[in-house]
Amino acid sequence: MQQDKVNLLGLNQKAIEDFFISIGEKKFHARQVFKWIHKKGVIDFDAMTDLGKNLRHKLKEKAQITIPKVVFSKASKDGTHKWLIDVGGSAVETVFILAEGRGTLCVSSQVGCTLNCSFCSTGKQGFNRNLSAAEVIAQLWIAARTLSKTDGEHDFTVTNIVMMGMGEPLMNFENVVPAMDIMMDDLAYGLSRRKVTLSTSGVVPRIYDLLEQSGVSLAVSLHAPNDMLRNEIVPINKKYNIDELLEACKLYAQKGPHKHITFEYTLIEEVNDNLSDAEELVALLKSREVPAKINLIPFNPYPGTPYKKPSNNRIHRFKEFLQHNGFVTTVRKTRGDDIDAACGQLAGDVMDKTNRKQRYLKKLGDTNAN
């Protein structure tokens, strides 16, 4: 039966080797298939020309390589690309962002999100389910195969991965870690740990697990300089407070691929963008002795939000204060906002929880009609 076949797409190198041993085949054949899938983009066993006929026949009986369907894709004038990907009747978004010298793919880990951060549009649609490892790595497979390498002006090679799309990746640890293993495998995409970044809102126990089992680069969605405000806008803080979070971050900085943690801080007008907030943030990070780089993200408004984007003057003032106090600070440029691909807009084409499937099916029907 089709449903009994193993989808090889989501198996990291060890898992695919174990599968081949279980069907009486050698590990080196597993590595051949692994390379065909991820390095060469081939998903037809018959096209894997260095495999024997009998092995290809056995694989067709016992395994499959299933790639989710791309419902539609969009390209922004600034080179940003976005895909809406079918994951079994629901949909997730993947975004490719061009910047000087690199191409970053923003990968989703869940359909929706459980954390319900007050300023994030993804959380407003509710939570459906975790993505499988195959559905996570498929986003990179699709991007690597469908992006043109160059348009004469831009290089569309994926050089960096950020697990910053829809969902909280550490709430889907068991599937995200094997997918990241594939991203970093030299027989697959060959990205270094420094080029794969996982962003978390602060699932503290899993930060320790991540350091032990993967050790990719870590970014933390902080967004507030104290527990009172963070409890309000990042509710997981009620379970794992700032002290616990920064303790985990300090250890990760000591042992991870970078000697600092990137803290993401979404600037929301008159909520967390006051000079007093900047002062408190500086005092917090210095007192905890966490090596930090700060990435300021101007809030991206979406329909129904009560929040506003700060003025450029307020953003500049906040940044200047942090820099004056010794912190490397960047302001994230808004990219892809004309196709709802900017940070915080990843629910634009994916629907609220109650209407998700109906609207998805309508989108699918409209796409097929075209």
UniProtKB/Swiss-Prot annotation:
The active site is at E93, C343. It is an enzyme of class 2 (transferase). Disulfide bonds join C106-C343. This is Dual-specificity RNA methyltransferase RlmN. SMART domains: Elp3. GO terms for biological process: rRNA base methylation; tRNA methylation. Binds 1 [4Fe-4S] cluster. The cluster is coordinated with 3 cysteines and an exchangeable S-adenosyl-L-methionine. The keyword S-adenosyl-L-methionine applies. Specifically methylates position 2 of adenine 2503 in 23S rRNA and position 2 of adenine 37 in tRNAs. m2A2503 modification seems to play a crucial role in the proofreading step occurring at the peptidyl transferase center and thus would serve to optimize ribosomal fidelity. It comes from Francisella tularensis subsp. tularensis (strain SCHU S4 / Schu 4). One of its GO terms (cellular component) is cytoplasm. S-adenosyl-L-methionine binds at G167, E168, S199, S221, L222, H223, N300. Transmembrane segments: none annotated. It catalyses: adenosine(2503) in 23S rRNA + 2 reduced [2Fe-2S]-[ferredoxin] + 2 S-adenosyl-L-methionine = 2-methyladenosine(2503) in 23S rRNA + 5'-deoxyadenosine + L-methionine + 2 oxidized [2Fe-2S]-[ferredoxin] + S-adenosyl-L-homocysteine; adenosine(37) in tRNA + 2 reduced [2Fe-2S]-[ferredoxin] + 2 S-adenosyl-L-methionine = 2-methyladenosine(37) in tRNA + 5'-deoxyadenosine + L-methionine + 2 oxidized [2Fe-2S]-[ferredoxin] + S-adenosyl-L-homocysteine. The lineage of its organism: Bacteria, Pseudomonadati, Pseudomonadota, Gammaproteobacteria, Thiotrichales. Its EC number is 2.1.1.192. Keywords: 4Fe-4S, Cytoplasm, Disulfide bond, Iron, Iron-sulfur, Metal-binding, Methyltransferase, rRNA processing, S-adenosyl-L-methionine, Transferase, tRNA processing. Gene3D superfamilies: 1.10.150.530, Aldolase class I (3.20.20.70). Its cofactor is [4Fe-4S] cluster. Belongs to the radical SAM superfamily. RlmN family. Its main location: cytoplasm. [4Fe-4S] cluster binds at C113, C117, C120. InterPro entries: Aldolase_TIM (IPR013785), Elp3/MiaA/NifB-like_rSAM (IPR006638), Methyltransferase_A (IPR040072), RlmN_N (IPR048641), RNA_MTrfase_RlmN (IPR027492), rRNA_lsu_MTrfase_RlmN/Cfr (IPR004383), rSAM (IPR007197).
